[in-house]
Amino acid sequence: MSPLCLLLLALALVAVPGARGACPVPADLKKSDGTRTCARLYENSDPYYDNCCQGPELSVDPGTDLPYLPSDWSNSASSLVVAQRCELTVWSLPGKRGKTRKFSTGSYPRLEEYRKGIFGTWAKSISGLYCKCY
């Protein structure tokens, strides 16, 4: 393999971890007392991954069922992280109505990249949620 190919491969491998941006690793989602957190939603997103998962945050405990998000969080989440062995189900309308999507373990720094139907995205579109862990 040529040195140029090796260099390009090395650069590609180094760039992959940055795709998570500033989001925490799913295994690190814990409260200060060490108890488990199911998911964490963030209000601010950015075209640059390094600036995502910042600003106000909403931590969701395992088993949380919120058909109506608090008024300051309804349709405002633009990044989220789901803890290990957990799943977050979201709805686009209050009362668990409208479009739905399940997010499994992982970091989702830009919800603009996840389609909600033909014309929309999940950025600033979450009005209800249910989070469960296994």
Curated annotation (Swiss-Prot):
Keywords from the named record: Cytoplasmic vesicle, Disulfide bond, Exocytosis, Membrane, Signal
Topology relative to the membrane: Peripheral membrane protein
Tissue: Specifically expressed in pancreas and also detected in secretory granules of parotid gland (at protein level). Expressed in pancreas, spleen, small intestine, lung and neutrophilic granulocytes (at protein level). Expressed by epithelial cells in duodenum and colon.
Expression induction or repression: Down-regulated in small intestine upon fasting.
Gene3D superfamilies from the UniProt entry: Crystallins
Any Gene Ontology CC annotation: zymogen granule membrane
Pfam families, A to Z: Syncollin
Post-translational modification as stated in the protein's UniProt record: Contains intrachain disulfide bonds.
Signal peptide from the UniProt entry: 1-21
Role, per record: Functions in exocytosis in pancreatic acinar cells regulating the fusion of zymogen granules with each other. May have a pore-forming activity on membranes and regulate exocytosis in other exocrine tissues.
Complex and partners: Monomer and homooligomer; most probably hexameric. Interacts with GP2. According to PubMed:10753942 interaction with syntaxins shown in PubMed:9244306 is physiologically questionable.
Record PANTHER family: SYNCOLLIN (PTHR17503:SF0)
Name by which UniProt lists this protein: Syncollin
UniProt source species: Rattus norvegicus
